[in-house]
Amino acid sequence: MPPNSVDKTNETEYLKDNHVDYEKLIAPQASPIKHKIVVMNVIRFSYLHIAGLYGLYLCFTSAKLATSVFAIVLFFLGNFGITAGAHRLWSHNGYKVKLPLEILLMVFNSIAFQNTIFTWVRDHRLHHKYTDTDADPHNATRGFFFSHIGWLLVRKHPMVKIAGKSLDMSDIYCNPLLRFQKKYAIPFIGTICFIIPTLAPMYFWGESLNNAWHITVLRYIFSLNGTFLVNSAAHLWGYKPYDKSLKATQSGMANAFTFGEGFHNYHHVFPWDYRADELGDRYINLTTRFIDFFAWMGWAYDLKTASTNIIEKRALRTGDGTYKRPNGMN
C-alpha cells in the first residue's frame, strides 16, 4: 500500500446517496429524441480536428523535433491535470493534496482545457450519479458517437439540466483556486492551453507560427479524444469483472490514452478508490504512479483504496465471471 493511504472496508458507506432514480436505458431501446444541434460547436470541433490532422502531417514534414517533443510533454502534463486532478481528486475526493500540488494540478488541467474544473466535475458527478440515463450528460445508451463527442454538439437533455441543479458542488465552490480558474477561464486557460504552447516554440527554437499552432491543436485534440474514449469505448466494449449490470467496462484502448482511466468497470463500482483500478500500477496506470510519487513527497495524503476483501466479494457477487485474483494479493 502506498504512503498516506487509507483502506476503505465499508462499501455501503460510499454507495449511500439519496437521489431520484432515473430510468436506465438499454441501447436498442433508448427512446428517440430530436437533438438541437449547436452549430458553432460543430464548426469549432470540426476545425479543431481538421487542424489537428494537419498538425500531425506537419510533425513528419516540416516541424522541428523540439516542437513535437514539447507537445508530447504538454500532453502528459495536461492529462495528469485531468486524470489526477479533475477526476480522481476533485470529482471523487479519492485523496487529498497540499496547496503546491493543488496549484500544479490546476495549471496542468488548464493545459488540457476540457472546460473549467467546475464544469468537468459537475458533468462527471452527474455521469456517476445517473449513469447511462438521460440525466447522464454523455449517456452511452445513445451510441458511440453521442457518448464520444456528439453530446458536446447538441443542447443538453432537459433531465441533465434538472439533475445538475440539485447536484452538491459545495466543495468546488468553496475552493478559491477553482473559483479563480472558473472566473478567469477564457484568458487564463486560453493562454496556458493555446497561446504559450504556440509562442514558446517560436521564441525559443525558431519554429514557424503555422507549425507551432497546428501541433498545439494536435496535442489538444489528441488529449480530448483520449478522455472521450472513456465515455464511449469504455461504456460499450470490454469485460465486466466487477459488475456485469453496468455498461462501464475494462477498456484497454481507453486505458492506453488516459494513463489508467480505462479500468472503468472497477471505477464505477469503487469510484472513491484513488487508483481507479484494483492494483493501480498494472499496465500503464501512470496516474496512480503520479499520485504515489507525490504521496511519497508528502504533497498527497489520505489516499483511499477499496480493500481486497470487498473487491473480491463484489466481483463474485455481481461480476461477469472474468475476475482473476491479482498475483501477490493476500
Curated annotation (Swiss-Prot):
Pfam families documented for this protein: FA_desaturase
Motif (Histidine box-3): 264-268
GO biological process terms held by the UniProt record: fatty acid biosynthetic process; pheromone biosynthetic process; unsaturated fatty acid biosynthetic process
Tissue expression from the record: Highly expressed in the pheromone gland.
UniProt catalytic activity: an 11,12-saturated fatty acyl-CoA + 2 Fe(II)-[cytochrome b5] + O2 + 2 H(+) = an (11Z)-Delta(11)-fatty acyl-CoA + 2 Fe(III)-[cytochrome b5] + 2 H2O; (11Z)-hexadecenoyl-CoA + AH2 + O2 = (10E,12Z)-hexadecadienoyl-CoA + A + 2 H2O
Topology in the lipid bilayer: Multi-pass membrane protein
UniProt motif Histidine box-1: location: 87-92
Assigned keywords, A-Z: Fatty acid biosynthesis, Fatty acid metabolism, Iron, Lipid biosynthesis, Lipid metabolism, Membrane, Metal-binding, Oxidoreductase, Transmembrane, Transmembrane helix
GO molecular function, one term: stearoyl-CoA 9-desaturase activity
EC number: 1.14.19.15, 1.14.19.5
Top-level taxon: Eukaryota
Compartments in which it is found: Membrane
CDD domains: Delta9-FADS-like
InterPro entries associated with the record: Acyl-CoA_DS, FA_desaturase_dom, FADS-1_CS
Residue numbers covered by motif Histidine box-2: 124-128
UniProt main location, coarse: membrane
Cofactor(s) of this protein: Fe(2+)
Positions of transmembrane segments: 37-57, 65-85, 101-121, 185-205, 216-238
Entry domain remark: The histidine box domains may contain the active site and/or be involved in metal ion binding.
Family in the record: Belongs to the fatty acid desaturase type 1 family.
Function recorded in the entry: Fatty acid desaturase that catalyzes 2 consecutive steps in the biosynthesis of bombykol, a sex pheromone produced by the moth. First acts as an acyl-CoA Delta(11) desaturase (1) by catalyzing the formation of Delta(11) fatty acyl precursors. Then acts as a (11Z)-hexadec-11-enoyl-CoA conjugase (2) by converting a single cis double bond at position 11 of (11Z)-hexadec-11-enoyl-CoA into conjugated 10 trans and 12 cis double bonds.
Protein name: (11Z)-hexadec-11-enoyl-CoA conjugase
Source organism per UniProt: Bombyx mori (Silk moth)
